[in-house]
């Protein structure tokens, strides 16, 4: 068994999808650690891989305790992230993940694969009773993460007027992939830098806007520096509302 542990935000799982698919092989047996709140999304992401198993762990200490308990002779592990070295040049978080394993960052896009459930997506889409054009917005008006500096609410003045706005609704689903059809059919997609932005980037859509917040701790992970081949994000910088 090879145990895989990585940074555990949902956006990190999108960043590392192509990396993990590059590192594993069909003859191995793998177990990926995942937070309970992201389990449904990550299980669907890798549901095409019969040799991928999952263990729920919410902190790195839980991962360490679990490995100490179950690790056997002959087992191995893949660590993605943690103990970031000084590369001598500026690198984003996702570049660090790939450089750490000597994998080309282009594999983030070239090797990305996520299984979609079109029936689930359609059922979810129909909940919004859409009869007109709309834009899709993901921001965060209630961010209470201790490492963040308050909510990142997209200023409505930066959004098109006279069009329906559909925002991500907390707790309406535990599976981010349910939103795929809703995102694909939007006239525009506006996101803060987040798991929705990373997923949308990898879906290779058009009409995309990334709202970057200079005070955000994730500012060095900016999407639009690396996606010139695929999704054409337009950058909008705005301080917290």
Give names to the regions the model predicted:
Residues 1-241:
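Catalytic machinery of carbohydrate-active enzymes
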């Amino acid at each position: 068994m090879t145990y895989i542990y990585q940074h555990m935000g949902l956006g990190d799982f999108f960043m590392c999808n192509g990396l993990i698919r590059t590192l594993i092989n069909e003859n191995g047996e793998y177990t990926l650690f995942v937070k309970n709140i992201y389990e449904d999304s990550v299980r669907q992401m890798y549901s095409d891989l019969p040799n991928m198993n999952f263990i729920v762990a919410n902190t790195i200490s839980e991962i360490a305790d679990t490995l100490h308990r179950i690790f056997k002779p002959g087992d191995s592990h893949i660590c993605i992230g943690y103990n970031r070295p000084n590369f001598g040049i500026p690198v984003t978080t996702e570049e660090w993940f790939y450089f750490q394993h000597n994998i080309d960052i282009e594999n983030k896009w070239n090797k990305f694969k996520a299984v979609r459930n079109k029936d689930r997506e359609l059922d979810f889409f129909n909940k919004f009773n859409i009869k007109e054009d709309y834009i899709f917005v993901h921001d965060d008006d209630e961010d209470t993460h201790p490492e963040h500096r308050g909510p990142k609410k997209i200023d409505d003045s930066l959004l098109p007027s006279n069009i329906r706005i559909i925002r991500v609704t907390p707790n309406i689903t535990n599976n981010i992939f349910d939103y795929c059809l809703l995102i694909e059919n939007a006239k525009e997609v506006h996101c803060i830098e987040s798991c929705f932005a990373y997923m949308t980037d990898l879906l290779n859509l058009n009409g995309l806007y990334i709202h970057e917040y200079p005070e955000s701790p994730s500012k060095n992970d900016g999407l639009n520096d690396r996606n010139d081949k695929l999704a054409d994000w337009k950058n909008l910088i705005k301080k917290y509302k």
